[in-house]
UniProtKB/Swiss-Prot annotation:
One of its GO terms (biological process) is L-methionine salvage from methylthioadenosine. This is Enolase-phosphatase E1. Pathway: Amino-acid biosynthesis; L-methionine biosynthesis via salvage pathway; L-methionine from S-methyl-5-thio-alpha-D-ribose 1-phosphate: step 3/6; Amino-acid biosynthesis; L-methionine biosynthesis via salvage pathway; L-methionine from S-methyl-5-thio-alpha-D-ribose 1-phosphate: step 4/6. GO terms for cellular component: cytoplasm; nucleus. Its EC number is 3.1.3.77. InterPro entries: Enolase-ppase_E1, ENOPH1_eukaryotes, HAD-like_sf, HAD-SF_hydro_IA, HAD_sf. Its cofactor is Mg(2+).
């Protein structure tokens, strides 16, 4: 499908596969969280934040499933919870307490300089161009809001956080549910037809479209190839350069 002459008041961007390479998330961020989970939990075990995360992790249905694989009734300690964190990450389960913990672990990595957020080279220019045109830019990702901010604040293109006016994660709802996008429109106080959602996942695009949003699919290097049906159902771009002419209605 060709790119229409688009107008929008808000550009809502996904992160993984849209502003940031999938490989950065899966080959850098996830392994970093797996490798550093136990150390972080040991360091912060007595803090209120970690206690809450540990409690929330144990309430997940997957926890009983994981514990049953260990053979005995294990003590709930940093080693056990770190093992469960690795279990969840290996299964790519996007559950909120895991995302919260990952965000805290990554925060230490960014602060130490061990991590820098990947963004595609066209992202910073597009953000600047859209802001100059008077558009707001918001982020909706399955990663926690804290983790989102870290990627853009400590990005390889510099601090991009000032360009972003709002952040949404799974607290607002899952990304393949129409209600999530309706709620985002309400929070942004803008009609859904004035929101352009950019993502690499057709099922997310379908949910956003059902809520009344404009949608465009990204076919970045390393993304899952789009089918002919998906390409005929949605406008598709390879980068943000084609969207520099985006303007307000």
């Amino acid at each position: 499908m060709t790119i229409p002459d688009l107008t929008a008041k808000v550009v809502l961007v996904d992160i993984e596969g849209t502003t940031t390479s999938i490989s950065f998330v899966h080959e850098v961020l996830f392994p970093y969280a797996k490798q550093n989970a136990e150390h972080y939990l040991l360091e912060t075990w007595e803090t209120d934040a970690t206690k809450q995360i540990v409690q929330d992790l144990q309430l997940l249905p997957q926890f009983a499933e994981y514990a049953s694989t260990l053979g005995t009734q294990p003590a709930v300690d940093a080693q056990l919870i770190a093992g469960f964190v690795r279990y969840l990450i290996e299964r790519d389960l996007k559950v909120t307490p895991l995302k919260t913990l990952q965000g805290l672990i990554w925060a230490k990595g960014y602060a130490s300089g061990q991590l820098r957020g990947h963004v595609y080279e066209d992202v910073a220019t597009a953000f600047h161009t859209w802001r100059e045109a008077g558009l707001r830019i918001a982020v909706y990702s399955s990663g926690s809001v804290a983790a989102q901010k870290l990627i853009f604040q400590h990005s390889i293109a510099g601090d991009l956080l000032p360009h972003l006016s709002a952040h949404f994660d799974t607290h607002v709802g899952h990304k393949q549910q129409t209600e999530s996008y309706t709620k985002i429109s309400q929070i942004l106080q803008v009609e859904p037809q004035h929101v352009l959602f950019l993502t690499d996942v057709p099922l997310e695009a379908a949910a956003a479209r059902a809520a009344g949003m404009l949608t465009i699919l990204l076919q970045r290097p390393g993304n899952v190839p789009l089918s002919e049906e998906e390409r005929s159902s949605y406008p598709v771009v390879e980068d943000f350069v084609a969207l520099h002419t985006l303007k307000q209605p």
